[in-house]
Each structure stands twice: as C-alpha cells, then as structure tokens.
Amino acid sequence: MGLRAGRLASPSRGVLQLLRLPLLLLLLLSSGARGAAAQGDTEVPTLYLWKTGPWGRCMGDDCGPGGIQTRAVWCAHVEGWTTLHTNCKQAVRPSNQQNCFKVCDWHKELYDWRLGTWDRCQPVISKSLEKSRECVKGEEGIQVREIMCIQKDKDIPAEDIICEYFEPKPLLEQACLIPCQKDCIVSEFSPWSECSRTCGSGLQHRTRHVVAPPQYGGSGCPNLTEFQVCQSNPCEEDESLYSLQVGPWSACSVPHTRQARQARRRGKNKEREKERGKAVKDPEARELIKKKRNRNRQNRQENRYWDIQIGYQTRDVTCLNRTGKSADLSFCQQERLPMTFQSCVITKECQVSEWLEWSPCSKTCHDVTSPTGTRVRTRTITQFPIGSEKECPALEEKEPCVSQGDGAVLCATYGWRTTEWTECHVDPLLSQQDKRRANQTALCGGGVQTREIYCIQTNDNMLSHGNTQKDKEASKPVDSKLCTGPVPNTTQLCHVPCPIECEVSPWSAWGPCTYENCNDQQGKKGFKLRKRRITNEPTGGSGATGNCPHLLEAIPCEEPSCYDWKSVRLGDCEPDNGKSCGPGTQVQEVVCINSDGEEVDRQLCRDAIFPIPVACDAPCPKDCVLSAWSSWSSCSHTCSGKTTEGKQTRARSILAYAGEEGGIRCPNISALQEVRSCNEHPCTVYHWQTGPWGQCIEDTSVSSFNTTTTWNGEASCSVGMQTRKVICVRVNVGQVGPKKCPESLRPETVRPCLLPCRKDCVVTPYSDWTPCPSSCREGDSGARKQSRQRVIIQLPANGGKECSDPLYEEKACEAPPTCHSYRWKTHKWRRCQLVPWSIQQDVPGAQEGCGPGRQARAITCRKQDGGQASIQECLQYAGPVPALTQACQIPCQDDCQFTSWSKFSSCNGDCGAVRTRKRAIVGKSKKKEKCKNSHLYPLIETQYCPCDKYNAQPVGNWSDCILPEGKAEVLLGMKVQGDSKECGQGYRYQAMACYDQNGRLVETSRCNSHGYIEEACIIPCPSDCKLSEWSNWSRCSKSCGSGVKVRSKWLREKPYNGGRPCPKLDHVNQAQVYEVVPCHSDCNQYIWVTEPWSVCKVTFVDMRDNCGEGVQTRKVRCMQNTADGPSEHVEDYLCDPEDMPLGSRECKLPCPEDCVISEWGPWTCALPCNPSGSRQRSADPIRQPADEGRACPDAVEKEPCSLNKNCYHYDYNVTDWSTCQLSEKAVCGNGIKTRMLDCVRSDGKSVDLKYCEELGLEKNWPMNTSCTVECPVNCQLSDWSSWSQCSQTCGLTGKMIRKRTVTQPFQGDGRPCPSLMEQSKPCPVKPCYRWQYGQWSPCQVQEAQCGEGTRTRNISCVVSDGSAEDFSKVVDEEFCANTELIIDGNKQIVLEETCTQPCPGDCYLNDWSSWSLCQLTCVNGEDLGFGGIQVRSRAVIIQELENQHLCPEQMLETKSCDDGQCYEYKWVASAWKGSSRTVWCQRSDGINVTGGCLVVSQPDTDRSCNPPCSQPHSYCSEMKTCRCEEGYTEVMSSNSTLEQCTLIPVVVIPTVEDKRGDVKTSRAVHPTQPSINPAGRGRTWFLQPFGPDGRLKTWVYGVAAGAFVLLVFIVSMIYLACKKPKKPQRRQNNRLKPLTLAYDGDADM
C-alpha cells in the first residue's frame, strides 16, 4: 500500500507544481500592476514591448551538445504593429540565441521514452457531482503516468526534445472507467448438519460459500453460517464434559548441553586417536585407515551442504470443559496421556554463495538491428534447505549487455542468393491432355523456369581480408536458418520465342526475255524471270531467309533484250493520199520499258526495233464497217512443249454492212478472229535452291577477342562464319548444272555470325562442415556424420568448363564422449536419536533409552560407474533428493517386536491368483497378548498377482490419406522442375489402444501391436478440362474484302478433383470455345470476262438494206484471275452477281450510207461524287454518211451523277481485333492480334483496295499489335514438412501434423491449389503415468480428543488415457520410475500437515471452499477488460451458543485469473400456488445465488387482494385487483371496487332442424353495453358454417380453397387473352453453326 500511495502522490505533486506557476505569474502581474500604479504619477507607462518568435532548428557541426539555435526578436507596439528596435528598452531585450542539443539519426539507438505505469483511476470531479441513481456501466475517470526521455545506456534523464525528434511524446493521461459497485454474491445454503450432540439439546448449522466477492466499493458478504437448536433423544448417561486437548509442537531446539558434550567428546576422541595411532604401526593398516578417513572426510564435505541437526520439540496437553476453560488433567479420564515431546530436525534455510563475476557479453560484435546481448553470473548453494518450505533463490542471473570497446567488429549479416535461372520449359504448363498428344520437343511461347536459393554471409569479405578472387565471386553457403529476410522467388514465367514461318507473295507474271545482267550483255543467253517477295520474315530455326522457299524462277530464252518498245495505244486511221476514206495506216504511240516493265528513257531502246505503223481501212460511206480489234486474250499456256502450245486470240465484229453498189463487202466469219502463238519458250523452269545455314564456326582470319564468361557476366564473344549449300534445280526434275540458272542471281553461300558465349560451370565454395554433436551421446550408438555442400550457380554452356567436383561431401564425426548418468548414493542410517533423558524424565511412564526418535543419513553424488561427482550434477540430473531423515523406534520392553517382512511368494495360476508375504513375532513379544492381535499387528499380507490378459481396440478417428514418402531428385545442385506425386494409393491410420483386464491402459506392445491399424486409401488424381482438337477454319465470311473465319473446340470432359478449369466458354453454347480471326478475300480473285458483242441481228429484216433495230449478244464467263491474267473458267457463283455484265442488249444496225459511230467510251465522273454534277461518255464516228445532209449525230451522252447509283464514295474500314493468336506450338505467352483494312463503297459494299489507294486515302491504323495469353501455371507446393512432435506426450488424442506451403500460386487456367495444406496422423497411444495424491486422512490427534493433530496422505502412481472423462487407475510405482515427482505442477511434495481438531463446544472455521469459477466484470455480456477474479471462503461453525463471543471472523480470499466468463443474474419465479410463489436469483449458468439481482426489479411473491374478492364469479388477478371470470362483465363502484359480476347476454341463431331456437352459436354483443334485439325475424341458414363448438366446419375450408383456385384460373385466362403475342423473330447467323454437345450447365464451367 505504501508503494501504491507513493505512486499516487507523485503525479499529484507534479500537478500542484504546475498549478503554482500560473499563481506566481498572477501574483507577479498583480504586484507589477500595483507598482506601476504607484509610479504612475512620476513615470509614463511604456507603449512598446519586445516580442519573440519560436526557436529555430538546432544547428551545429557535431552531433550532441554544442549546437546553437536562434529565434527572431522584434519590438512591437502594444496594439500589435512592429516598430523600430530603439523604441524598446535595450536592457530587457530577450536573447535571440541559445545553446542546444543537436539530434542526429544515430541517437535513436541511445535515447527513448520511458513510460511509467498508469496510476489508479480517479473519478472526474465535475462528473462525480452528477451521479445517476442507477449505475449501468460505470463512472468515468482519468489516470496519469510519468513519462521521461532517458539515455538508455546510462539510464539518466535527457531533454524531451531529443526523444520528440524521433517519436512524439506519448500521452500523459488517458480516460478510464471505474466500474459499478459489485456487492458480494453467495450461494445457497447447504443442508442442515447433524445435531452437535447425540442426545439432549444441541445445535445444527448450515453454510454457504462466496460466489463473487464485493468489488469497487460494493457491500460486504452476509453471514455464511446459519444455526438452529436441535433436540435429540434424552441422554441416558451423563455426557462427558471434559476433553483432552493437545497444543501445537514447539519449534525444534537443540539441548543446551550439546555443545559442551560434543567438545568433551571431541577431546576424548582425539586422545583415543593418538593412542590408536601410536598402537598401529603396520603400514597396510595405516593405509586402510587413511583411505577410510579420506572417504569419511569426503562424505562430510558432501554432507556439509545439509548439516543435519536433530533436536527435540514439545507441546502442551490440557483438559478443557465445554466452555473452553482449562481444568485439571485428572478430570480427563484416560489411561495414557499423549506424548509431549518428540525428536525433530532443526530447520535450516537455504544459503547461497556470493555471485561470481559476470560472464563475457554474448554479443561480441556490433549489430545495428539488435545491439544488445546477454551476460550471465552464477552462484552456488552452500546450505540446502532442511525442513523449510522456502525454495532456494535463483542461482543464475541474466542481464542485457552491449559489446564493449570501440574496436568491436561488425556482426555477420546474412542474405539470400540465387543460382541462375534454368532454361525456359514449356512442358510444365501443358495440361494432361496436351502432354499425351503433343510433341513436346518444339514447344514455344510462355514457360516456367526455376532456380535455387541459398543463404550466404553478406559481409564475409569485410570481415576476412585474405579471400581469393574466386571466393569473392561466389560466397560459400551457410545454414538457411540464418537468413531471416523474405525468401526470393524460385519460379518465374518466361518466354521461348516461337519460330515464325516464312510467308511469300504470289508469283508475278513472267517477264520478257532479258539478259541475266543488263550491265554485262556478253553472249546471247537470256532468261524469262518471274519473282515473288517475302511478306513475313521468318524468326527462329536457322534464322534469316534460310527457311524461305526460292523467290525467283528462270526460263532460258533466245534473243534477250534489256529494253523494248511498248505500244501504248493506236492512233486514228489516216487514209493514204489524203483521201477521206479507204486504205491507210495507224501510228502506234510507244514508250521505252525495261525488263521489269518500268518506263525508262527512250534512248535506251535505240537498239530495239521500233514498231512500224499498222495498216488500216477507213470505211467509205458504202463500205462494211468493222469494230476495232479486242485485246489479246491471256495466253492459254505458260510455256510451250511437245504437247502444249500457248495461243492468244482477239476478235472484231461487224458494225454495219456494205451497200449493194460499189461498197467493200464484209469479210467472212473466220476473218473476224485472229490467233497468235505466245509463251513459246519451253517448259523448263530453273531456280536456285538453298540449304539451311550450317553451324557457326570460329573464323581464324578475324582477330579473336573471345573471353570466358565469369559470374559477374562481363564477357565478349568472337565472330564466326556460316555456310550453306546452293544448287541449281530444274522444276520437277532435280539438280542440274549451275550454268542453267542465272549466275548473277545466285544466293550467298557464306555469311558472318556471332559465336555463342562460352559459360563455365560456376560453383560456390564448400560450406563449413556441419557441426558434430558437442554434447555427450546418450544411448545412441548410430554413427554421427558431418557434411558440407556447395551449390551450382551457373551451369556450363557452349563448350564451357564442366562441373566435375562432387557437390556433397560427408565424413564421420569423432566419437563424442559417453554421457555420464548420475545417481544419489545413500549411506547407512545413523543411530536413532531420542529426546534427551533430561527432557523426558519428568514425564510419567517415560523409559530411558527407548521410544520414538529420529535418525539421519549421509548422501553423496555418484556417476553410474561409481565415480565421484559434484553434488550439483545430481541436483540437475539425478532426480529428487532422497530422504535425509526418518522416524525411528528403539523398542521398549512393552513394545511388540517382529521380524522383517519376507519376500512375496511366487504367482501360480491364472488371473485372480494372490501372493503373500509373512513376518513373525520375535522375543518376549510372543508372550504378550496384544502382540498376537492380528488386527493391530498382521503377520500376513496378500496382494493380487499381475494379470497378463490384454485386449486391443481402435480409438479416435482415421488419419488423412497419406501417400508414401518419396525422395527428392537433385541434379548437380539444380532442382528438376516437375509435378510431385500428389495422388494415388496411400494409407490411412487409426490408433490402437491396449488395455489390461482391469481396463487400465498399457503399452501397445503388450497387445503385439505396433500401434496402428492401416487401411489402403485412394487420393483421386486431378483431371483437367478436356477439349477437342481445333476444327478446320471456316470459309471467310465475305467473298470480297475483309470478313472473319472461325474455328472451335468442343467440351469433351469437365475437370474434377481439382483439375485445370475449362477456359471461358461461349455464352450461347456452353460446350464450345471459339476462336475468331479476320480474313481477307481478294475482290479480283474471280472476275467476269466478256467476249466481243455479236453482230446486231435485226428483228425486222429489210431485205434490201439489211439494217434497222435488233439485238446483239455476247458470252460472259466467270474466270479465276492470276498474275498473268484470267486463267480458267470457274463456276459463276464465285463471281459477284451484282457486277455481272449484260449478255444481250438492243442495238441498231446502220443502213448503208448512214453514219456509223464506235462503241461508247467509259463514263467520266469526277470524285468526290457531287450530286449536282453530271457524267458523260462519248463515241467516235467511223464512217461518214454518203449524203452530206445527213450528218453524224452528237456522239456524247450526259446524265446527272447520283450517289450510290452511278457514282460512289470510297473509304477505309478497319475490322475488329482478332483473338490473341499464338504459335501452334505455344500454350501461352506473347502473341499477336490482327485486323484487316477494307475498302468500302458508300453503299456498304466491299470493293478492291485499289479504289481507296487510287484516291490516296490515309490509313494510319496499325494492323498488328502484341497481346498476351495468360499462362496456365499450376499451383506448386512445397514438400511435406517432417511430422511434428506429438501434440500430447501420452493419451489417446495425440496428433502429429505436417504442413506444406504454396511456393507458386496458380495463375490463369492453371490447376488451383488444393485445400488440404495440413495432414494429421494419430500418435501411438501411450499410457499417461503421473503421481497423484490420495485423500487426506481425518485429522488425527494422538491419544487426545482435540487440539493440534496431523493428517496424512499418500502418493500413488496412476494411469489414464489423458482425457478428462477417464478416471485415473492406480498401478505399480515402477511405471512412474521415469516420471518426475511433480503433482499439480509443484515439486514440493507434502504428505503430512498439521491440522486442528476442534474440541466440543469450540467455535471454529471450516475448510476453505473450492475456488469459484473465474468471473469477469461485464456490462451486457461484454468484458470491460478488468480481468477475471476467483474467490473462496471459510464459514464459522458454532457448537455452543455460550461460545459465540470466541468465534473468529469468516474469511474471504481472492485471486486473479485469465479464463473468465461473463455471467448474468436474473430473477426466477415459480408458478403461483394460490396467491403466493417463490422468487429467487439465478446466475446464467443455472446456480441459485443470493445477491447479484437488482432488488428494485424483484417480482412479487404475494398476489392476494385486499379486500378479498368475495363476489360470485370473481377472482384475484396478478395486478392484485378483483376481476370477473370469463363470460361475466364487471360492475364497478364509484371507488373503483368490484360490486358484482353480470352474465354477458348471447344472440340465439335458430336452425331449420330446430324451430324452437336452440342456441347453436353464442356471440357476445357489446359486452359492456345492454343487449338490443334487432327487429324482424332471425335469418335461417340451410348450411350452417359453424359447428356445435363454435368452430368452422371442414367443408367451409374446401369451398374457400375451390373459390380461390377458380379465381386464379379466371385471372390467368383474362391475362392470356389480352396479352399481345410476340412476332416470330428470325435470327441470322453468318457463322457456321457447330455441332453441339450435351452440357449440364455446371457452375464450374
């Protein structure tokens, strides 16, 4: 209390000091004011004052004291504005600079806040005046604490500003809660005790115990005892009025004469030894005596730890009457009085030596994170406690310390290091289905790579200076437990580049016959060439264009030329000799072109043959008119051979027939067509064929700068050369001579390349050898080994140095010393020491030299081999110290003497047999009758023989299914990536328990069992989602322009058992996965080809002129378009039907001598299309009319431009992105999304891209973009940990656990992590042996009726199965031989204790009650956080009313506890019995208590009415008022008392069956108003809905249900009739409809 009061006083003093400051300031200001007033007559008050700003930051060169901080100081007017410094008094100017402490970051380790403990919660003064009538939760309070900044190493205060630099100052005060007052709560009374007297008048009592102590100022506990007078049968004899009482034993003391007697005895002994030494002259005898003395001296040295002294103690024996007053011993009639003396051991407290020096600090280095270590000092026991209950103080003391000296080295720091990543592997990402059907050799795309981690000492190079360069490159690994930081990732996603196949354009048309090199035209050898180009460069494989097909083909030809004239168009036909008609010529307009068809300078064609003019005929008015020749058709064959010959045709038609007179007649039909040969070159095509590039070989001609790579990655690689084979190949034949192919176009055969860098194997140095066991070996004969290892951090590559040395080495440890086990050696008991005869000689009946006494013995510490050992070793390893003293008996003449017990006889027979042991009476005891009493002194003891019947039975649940453990594969230090075995056949286990015939648990080996039942089990393997192969791509959805093509997969099998989930399925058809990509169809792939119009066939033939209106036709065919022009006829549906030219038309055949004009030219329409504009076409006159009066008509047609009819706009359109496209060999990773560019006409039709290109429209959209398909990474788990220690050291419920962790979470559609991350397995059943106290014996007072006595108890070895329900069963003590002697957690074994047997008439305290349940302080079931409390109590027992004034106070004891609960108290009432009932308070766990319930809310226990309810048909209600029974109404008086109960009238409803109006149904009508009968007759019902009991009949419910169904039916019909039916919708789907599968719609899909 003193300490607590002191703590409470200190903050109050601080508060007072804080309050003093403003008071002093007020006094100073008031005195200053008075002084100013006094001087007001002589001195004018100043109008200017000095003002100061806050102190700035502490500045200085060094950390710590010595810094300087400044602040601003200025002069200001009293109104606040700043003025000149000269206006203020300079003498009182404040300082603008002061010294300060400069805080640096490293001060954080030296300074910190010291937080004091919170003081007691004090009520807030302002709130305490407003206390409510009823406390609900508690009273608000406040508590304070002391906080100071300290220098940690010196433990001295420092300025607060230093600590505030790093952390704000913690709160000095906080709100707290003072709970409501809690009154004492007690239990119900126990039953009444028996009467205190067996006859006559006595007392009986009953007690109760405390359930909850008073808290927070609550009221105290009521009396825990009630007593009442009881009457028994009258006493036949006088009851004894006196009792013999023994007092407590005195303290153990040593007789006064002992020291003198010992001194005399020592003197005599020395004289005897001297004489004996003189007498003994034999050297051997002297040696024996010397050894014995040394041994005795050692024993005495060991025994000095105990220094046992045996003394004596006495007690008083008095005779008491019933009032507790002493009387003469003669009144207590007894044959033999109790002993008043006995031998005892002098109590010795534990004594220890002085502390030894502190050990060196465990932290010998400097560590910033944990700078402190520990140091230890010890002391030893110099005197062990004897007869004392106090334990020895601690023999070891630890305290934190810091390594001393400035030269302390840095502590070793550790960190994780990693090996290089392994190659990227795609196969771990494959599903089960892909692994079975895929060729895994050429996989690419997203993959997984792994690496190992190992721990190293990161500052090893700083701590050791003699490291070699190799050691610095790679540090040696250390134990992984030393690295505490986050573990680096051991798995990551990677990417294997996918090879991109070479894509080429279509072949161009065959070019003209040209030299292979126009710059070198030696010889006449020429070639016709056709080419194609690479549209998509290949990657991967052999690289560059090695995988591309040949890009050029050649055909030998004759008469090559590099340049030639090309006819552009023919001029008009000019008649000869200036005539207007007749034969003439047409001049060709030509340009000079090269072999690629490009227009060049005309000078280059100077060697070429210039085209000559073409002969023609300008028709005269009466001549036949023919149309111009059509263009030559495509060549029928690309080359000419023996069976094939290329041909081209062209045709013309008759436009007008000739007149009958003098005109040139039209030619026959054969003259209207011309045929010529084409592609006359032979069908022998040659090309250069290239082989793959060879291996890159170092080129010695290039200076080598290759170096071997090191771990730091600094390397350079040399240049090499690659070659490949190039041959000339004839198509469809094979290799031919190289002269057949154009030499100048031969591909290169050699190219430079970079040699891959050589990488040597890099291995860490060996780790240190693992430590051998430093402690001694206990029974483990297995050879101990130590090992070391190293880690490959870089695998060799490209011809680097291989890893050859072993990665793991081990060697045998040196044999550790064998552990010494220690034991206590007990020596012979010394002689039995009695109480000195000088003490007991005055006691009546005492006999000298016999009786009870006490004897001691020496104990020493020995090794198992018998060698000497320190007493400290046995105290630590040899178990409890044997008894040093024991009671002994020197038999007197009247005592019975027996031989020692014999050994037990052998067991013969089955279970249930017994064995015996015997003893016999010795000497004069044979003649004493009392010694022959077998009840007092049994001569035979029996015990049951051990029984060997055992039965085994399973206990507990089955374990998880456990797979057999496999071995981890390690290859050159790099872990192999692969799935570990997680499914298949395993075993599950159930523990077996073995019991003997008495139901006691024994070792399972007794039942010939290894402790388990094994049962095979199956862990189902996960099955991934299985889809079909991709279907073929559908046709492009559009035949012209950009469309889409689709392929799909169907669902074949759903995933189960944690397999990979299915990808996101189509929302329409849940059984399919679609992939959609854009596609492009060339609009000119198929074109309409027309032949010339036929001759106009006149409908009404004028035989004379053969002219007039008619019809002409032509053939229209759909043909496939190629680079060489239309090639072959195809089906018409492949061409666009909207663009199909007309096959017939009306025509007009001119009459002779009429004007003849040519075919109409193309329409001209300027773009962009202007609706206000027009377009036109024209034709040229071919034959002039004979009559000049009949001129040729205007050969121009005009029509307005109409958008989307004869004039169009064009624009680019971009399709949607495709799905992410991966390589066929890829599972995931980087891919490409593509889209197409489309040229769309304004009417929405896709047309050829050339229409948009001719307009020069912008096209800035990217057509490709990169994308990523998330990789399906399966969940990767660590290996199972080792099995943990059993959760229970014994019993049935022990479990072993092993765990695993997720090393790589699943990603994407990878296999998810299993839920089972922990497995349990039952432990083998072991019996639980422990020591257990027996019950205390009754308090035994030796040969007296009351007073101080003793009670004893035994300890026994018991076995149980560890469960709370199992009752422990006693077994032989040998089973507990290896069990430490601890009972209820206490090593101090108490088998005997003093007790008090109350004398008749005494008033005394009963035994302590059991500790109550742990109870928390709660409000509405919520803990307030004040901790739990338990209580026990002692009640007062009264035996005589006259002795009440001698009664002690009842006792209460509390203690704090942790596992508390919230309890509620509420009133409970029984059912009313008449006008009364019982009401009691009950706790929420069902215990009836007194106190705890609020008195104001206690229910009534009596409900009788006053005055009583005497009126007929009335009763007393719960509200204690008179009420009427049912069917009656109350009539109240003016003073609100019941006067009478009036019958309530009823309405009679007559029925058909009974015209007399029997009462069928009665209903009260306004029970508080008079009944009024309605006028008229009562209505008669033929169907009565109510039965005789007033309830509805069954048929009424049926009618109601039928009516409801009918109503629902009518409403439904109305709704269906009025509802407007939906129009059937026809869905159009251009996509190919796939074959559907049955699918059950599982949510996991």
From Swiss-Prot:
Gene from which the chain derives: Thsd7a
Expression tissues: Detected on kidney podocytes along the glomerular capillary wall (at protein level).
Regions of compositional bias (Basic and acidic residues) in chain numbering: 270-288
Residues the record marks as carrying a glycan: 223, 321, 439, 489, 668, 706, 957, 1032, 1213, 1264, 1354, 1488, 1535
TM regions (residue ranges): 1596-1616
Gene3D superfamilies: Thrombospondin type-1 (TSP1) repeat
Signal sequence extent: 1-38
Coiled coil (residue ranges): 256-304
Biological process (GO), any one: angiogenesis
Domain notes: Sequence analysis combined with the expression of constructs corresponding each to two or three adjacent TSP type-1 domains suggests the presence of 21 TSP type-1 domains; not all of these are detected by standard bioinformatic tools.
Listed Pfam families: TSP1_ADAMTS, TSP1_spondin, TSP1_TSH7A-B_C, TSP_1
Annotated region (Disordered), positions in chain: 255-300
Protein name: Thrombospondin type-1 domain-containing protein 7A
Disulfide bonds: 424-494, 444-498, 455-483, 624-666, 635-639, 678-683, 696-753, 717-757, 728-741, 761-803, 772-776, 813-819, 961-1017, 983-1021, 994-1007, 1025-1062, 1036-1040, 1079-1083, 1201-1207, 1220-1267, 1228-1271, 1239-1252, 1275-1313, 1286-1290, 1323-1328, 1339-1395, 1346-1399, 1357-1376, 1403-1447, 1414-1418, 1457-1462
GO cellular component: extracellular region; plasma membrane; podocyte foot
PROSITE patterns linked: TSP1 (PS50092)
Superkingdom of the organism of origin: Eukaryota
SMART domains the record matches: TSP1 (SM00209)
Compositionally biased region (Basic residues): 258-269, 289-298
